[in-house]
Amino acid sequence: MESTRTEAIVLAAMDYRESDRIVTLFTLQYGKVRGVAKGAKRSARRFGPALEPFARIGVELVVREGLSSLRGADIVTLYPGIRRDLRAIGLAGYAVELVDRYLPDGAPSPRLFRLLSSYLERLDQGEPLPSDRRFFEANFLNILGYRISLDHCASCGVELPATAERRTGASGMILCANCGRYGASVGPEAAALLGRCIATGRFGAVLFSPQSLREAGTLLDGAIAAHLTRPLNSLAFLKQIEPD
């Protein structure tokens, strides 16, 4: 079969047999692709360090149902700034695992590819900001069709004005104070900033206060977990280094 070339971000890689690796890629053209890189463990010329997690690469592959075949890869960037910072490593690992777990095989999403690329570039530039993680998550959910409705109660449907008290419900839903009397509070500031995350689409444009960051984090954590069958492997480590 004829090979094709596309840009990709490495989501995961594992050793396979004596000399091969199985690699999960998020490609710009084909979406998520799993493939075998034959001889990757011994061929520095064809692959080198290009198959490391969250590397951005140009990859030559033969796309097939099931496992594709990787013919070669060139490094666009390894994001060296990320690899020098423990918190950045944890956040990048969380982001690529989130994409891997949510995205089905063979479903291209150029918007999500740009979002993930922008987040990795942001992490590569220096000290990771807690607000950036929540910005990424809010836009991630929006792109995949899981946007949290901030304007109406998910239970009774009542409209929630900007100054209304909001509560978290099951599965990361927003409830009015009456329906969500036992849920955690989401104040007007947190709700407004979450809305701005979607509206601006630019890292660094939205900064949460410590309180609004906690409130938004509780809501987003619930919304993300609601669509997963098991916890993310990266989450336990991330919670140790990124408490908010």
Swiss-Prot record:
This is DNA repair protein RecO. Belongs to the RecO family. It comes from the Bacteria. Keywords: DNA damage, DNA recombination, DNA repair. Gene3D superfamilies: Nucleic acid-binding proteins (2.40.50.140), Recombination protein O, C-terminal domain (1.20.1440.120). One of its GO terms (cellular component) is bacterial nucleoid. The gene is recO. It holds the Pfam family RecO_C. The keyword Cytoplasm does not apply. It comes from Geobacter metallireducens (strain ATCC 53774 / DSM 7210 / GS-15). The lineage of its organism: Bacteria, Pseudomonadati, Thermodesulfobacteriota, Desulfuromonadia, Geobacterales. Transmembrane segments: none annotated. Involved in DNA repair and RecF pathway recombination. PANTHER family: DNA REPAIR PROTEIN RECO. One of its GO terms (biological process) is double-strand break repair.
